[in-house]
Every structure is written in structure tokens, then in C-alpha cells.
């Protein structure tokens, strides 16, 4: 028993040390990435270079309490979520951003109740080791936005041919739609996200993105829109920031190579771009 207690204490201290290190270190890979197959296209961007539209949409849709909540999660909501799960009902709230990030960094995909409880414990450790801004920055850099595509830097260049500081509201809504099922998201040959209902993946993304285009603006209207960004202590606009090493203002080479490898003939590319505008 004493041996087990020592092991648990060592694991707890190691986890705390890892979370504290995230104040200075950008993790090159996460447990969630290792669960996937293939490459991990993952280029980092500092939060100050991310469009305020994307930041506001992410907070409003994923965790509107993030700017003001002291704890990693809302424990009342967590208990209701646990009760719903034990009664075989759907999740009434969804996981807040610190819980999602802690899971992505260290844990494995599972619906096991014990694993879910571990999510919550790690979320509490995380928010007391790093700032809320840093939590959001890491979340946006580690979230999956497509097969092998991780982080908003790679996502904006891959889908929209633009840096993350030039995203529009509509770009943000579309990426919010990709988050629930990123393995089905693909780039159109001329740019944009494939939402062609004639293909299985396109049909899935069409439904998810159209839903996000309805619900994310509603969430923003309820929760304060860009005021959420200011509540996080983020001021100014992203594209007015001076260039820096983590600005992601140049297309990453691995994304350029991926686009080139998947490029279709010019005629098909033109048709795809026209289709994107037709359904936007």
C-alpha cells in the first residue's frame, strides 16, 4: 500500500512539473496525436497572432465560462454530465476547454468513467499551473482540424490559404464545424473545406459546418461576442501585431507539400472553387 502511495505521488509530481513546464515549452506532440495514424502536421502560432474572431468563436462555442471561471471545470455541470452518462443519456454540456486540453496532452480516447474523472482532476491541475490565455493558446495549437492536421496555424493555411490572423467570422464558424469530426474534413482543390454532399465525408462536414454556422453566432450573441476576447485579457487585433517567430504568417512547408501532393488538374480545381462559393 505504501509503495502504491509513493507511485501515485511521483506520478502527481511529474504531472504537475509537466504542466508547469508548459509556461515555456510548446509540446511538439501530444498523447492524442500519437493515437492517430500517419504524420502529425503541427506548426505553432502564438495566441496574439490568432484572429479575434476565431478566439471568440472558440470560447463561445466550447467554453464560455473560461475567462471568468476560477476552476478548471464547472463541478456542478461535471456532476450533471456524470449523472447523464451513468443513465445512458447524452452529454448536456460538453467538456470545457481545460478538460479537453488535459485529455489531449496526456490521456487516451475512452468513455470509461474513471478516465473521465481523471480528465477533471488533470484540468484542475492544469489551470493552476498555467494562465487561461496559455490554456487557450495550447488548445488552439493542439486541436485536430483534419486528418493529420493539428492546430489553427496549419488549419487556416491548409483550408483557406491564409494565416490565422486574417481569418473571417465565416472561417471561424467552419473550423468550429470541423472540430467534432476532423477525420472527415478535406481541402477542396482550389481552397476551402469540402462540403460536397455527393461524397460521404463531404456530407458529414456539410451537416456539421452548417450547424456551426447557425449555433456559433447564437452562442456569441448570448455570451458577448468579442467581449469574451477582452475578458481573456487579449487586446488589439491579430494582424496589427509585429512579425515574430511564432506568427505563422508564412505557409508551413509541410502544409505546402501536402497541398501540392493532393492537387488536382486546373479544370477540376476551378470547378471545386466555384462549388465552394455556391454553397457558402
Regions found by a protein language model. Give the residues of each.
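Juxtamembrane regions of bacterial inner-membrane/periplasmic proteins
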Residues: 1-280
Amino acid at each position: 500500500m505504501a509503495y502504491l502511495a509513493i507511485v501515485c505521488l511521483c506520478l502527481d509530481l511529474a504531472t504537475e512539473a509537466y504542466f508547469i513546464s508548459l509556461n515555456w515549452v510548446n509540446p511538439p506532440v501530444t498523447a492524442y496525436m500519437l493515437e492517430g495514424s500517419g504524420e502529425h502536421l503541427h506548426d505553432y502560432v502564438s495566441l496574439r497572432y490568432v484572429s479575434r474572431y476565431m478566439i471568440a468563436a472558440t470560447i463561445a462555442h466550447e467554453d464560455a465560462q473560461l475567462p471568468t471561471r476560477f476552476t478548471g471545470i464547472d463541478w456542478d455541470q461535471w456532476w450533471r454530465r456524470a449523472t447523464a452518462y451513468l443513465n445512458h443519456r447524452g452529454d448536456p454540456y460538453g467538456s470545457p476547454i481545460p478538460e479537453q486540453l488535459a485529455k489531449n496532452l496526456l490521456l487516451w480516447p475512452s468513455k470509461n468513467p474513471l478516465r473521465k474523472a481523471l480528465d477533471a482532476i488533470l484540468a484542475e491541475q492544469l489551470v493552476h499551473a498555467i494562465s487561461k490565455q496559455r490554456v487557450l493558446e495550447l488548445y488552439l495549437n493542439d486541436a485536430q482540424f483534419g486528418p493529420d492536421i493539428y492546430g489553427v496555424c496549419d488549419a487556416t493555411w491548409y483550408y483557406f490559404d491564409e494565416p490565422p490572423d486574417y481569418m473571417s467570422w465565416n472561417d471561424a464558424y467552419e473550423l468550429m464545424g470541423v472540430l467534432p469530426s476532423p477525420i472527415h474534413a478535406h481541402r477542396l482543390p482550389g481552397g476551402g473545406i469540402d462540403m460536397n454532399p455527393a461524397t460521404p465525408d463531404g456530407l458529414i462536414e456539410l451537416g456539421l459546418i452548417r450547424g456551426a454556422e447557425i449555433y456559433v453566432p447564437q452562442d456569441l450573441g448570448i455570451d458577448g461576442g468579442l467581449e469574451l476576447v477582452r475578458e481573456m485579457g487579449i487586446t488589439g487585433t491579430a494582424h496589427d501585431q509585429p512579425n515574430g517567430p511564432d506568427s505563422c504568417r508564412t505557409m508551413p512547408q509541410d502544409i505546402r507539400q501536402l497541398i501540392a501532393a493532393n492537387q488536382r488538374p486546373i479544370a477540376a480545381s476551378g470547378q471545386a472553387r466555384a462549388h465552394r462559393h455556391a454553397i457558402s
